Structure formats: C-alpha cells, structure tokens
Amino acid sequence: FTDGLMKNGNFELAPKPEDMXGTVRVESLKAVKYXD
C-alpha cells in the first residue's frame, strides 16, 4: 500500500481512512513523511 503511494506519488488514489482499518491512515501519514 505505502510502497505504491511512494512510487506513484498519487496520494489522492489512496483508499479513504474510513473505508479501511485505522492502520491505513497511520501508514498513509508515514508515506507522506517519507515522500518529503
């Protein structure tokens, strides 16, 4: 999940936090940090 985000940089395509587990939100935030 985060690997795909980091490679593509398409954060808008990520599943919405409410659609998945709470960990997805945390991993998404981590991906944003690493991308910076």
Curated annotation (Swiss-Prot):
PTM entry text: N-glycosylated.
Phylogenetic classification of the source organism: Eukaryota, Viridiplantae, Streptophyta, Embryophyta, Tracheophyta
Protein name per UniProt: Allergen Act d 3
Organism: Actinidia deliciosa
Domain of life of the organism encoding this protein: Eukaryota
Keywords: Allergen, Glycoprotein
